[in-house]
C-alpha cells in the first residue's frame, strides 16, 4: 500500500512541476506578445548602417600612387596592384587595381593605412552574385559610388535606436524601433 501512495505522491509532484514549467514558459511568451516585431521586410525595408560600417571598398584611381601599402597591410594579400615604372619621371604609373570581395574579410586595414586616402569604405553590403568570379572588382567597378539607402524613395529606412536617440534626444524602449 505504501509504494502505491508514494507513487501517487511522486506523480502528483511531477505534475505540479510540469505545470509550473509550462506556466513559466507561457508567461515569457505572453510578455513578448505585446512587443513590436524586430525583424524587417528586407527588400522593402533596410537598416541604415552606422558611420563605422565596413562595406564595399570604394577606390579612386586618380589618387592612387601604386605604393602597395594596401597589399602589405592586408592579412591575406588581397588587393592586386599592377603598375609600370615610368623611367623618365621616376614614378610608378598604376595600370590595374582589383579586389576580390569573395575573399575579402572587410577588416579595413587597406583603408586605414592608405597614405593618399584613395580607398574608403561604403555603406553597400549587398554583394551577392550568382558566380563567384563576379565578386572580383577591378578599378572601374570599385570606382562606382553605391546608391545611398537614404536617397532611395522606394525603400523605407529603419534607423538604429542609437541613431534615433541622438537625433531626437529621447530614449526609446524595445517597443519603438521604427521612425514612423
UniProtKB/Swiss-Prot annotation:
Superkingdom per UniProt: Eukaryota
Coiled-coil intervals: none
GO cellular component, one term: chloroplast thylakoid membrane
Protein name as it appears in the record: NAD(P)H-quinone oxidoreductase subunit I, chloroplastic
Family classification: Belongs to the complex I 23 kDa subunit family.
Classification via InterPro entries: 4Fe4S_Fe-S-bd (IPR017896), 4Fe4S_Fe_S_CS (IPR017900), NADH_quinone_OxRdtase_chainI (IPR010226), NDHI (IPR004497)
One Pfam family recorded for the sequence: Fer4_9
Amino acid at each position: 500500500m505504501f509504494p502505491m501512495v508514494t507513487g501517487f505522491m511522486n506523480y502528483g509532484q511531477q505534475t505540479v512541476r510540469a505545470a509550473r514549467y509550462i506556466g513559466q514558459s507561457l508567461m515569457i511568451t505572453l510578455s513578448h506578445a505585446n512587443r513590436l516585431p524586430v525583424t524587417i521586410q528586407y527588400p522593402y525595408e533596410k537598416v541604415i548602417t552606422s558611420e563605422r560600417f565596413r562595406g564595399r571598398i570604394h577606390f579612386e584611381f586618380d589618387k592612387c600612387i601604386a605604393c602597395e601599402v594596401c597589399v602589405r597591410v592586408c592579412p591575406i594579400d588581397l588587393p592586386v596592384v599592377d603598375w609600370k615604372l615610368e623611367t623618365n619621371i621616376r614614378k610608378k604609373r598604376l595600370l590595374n587595381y582589383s579586389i576580390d570581395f569573395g575573399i575579402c574579410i572587410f577588416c579595413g586595414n587597406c583603408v586605414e593605412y592608405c597614405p593618399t586616402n584613395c580607398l574608403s569604405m561604403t555603406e553597400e553590403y549587398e554583394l551577392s552574385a550568382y558566380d563567384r568570379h563576379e565578386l572580383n572588382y577591378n578599378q572601374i567597378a570599385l570606382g562606382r559610388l553605391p546608391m545611398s539607402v537614404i536617397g532611395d524613395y522606394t525603400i523605407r529606412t529603419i534607423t538604429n535606436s542609437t541613431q534615433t536617440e541622438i537625433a531626437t534626444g529621447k530614449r526609446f524602449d524595445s517597443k519603438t524601433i521604427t521612425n514612423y
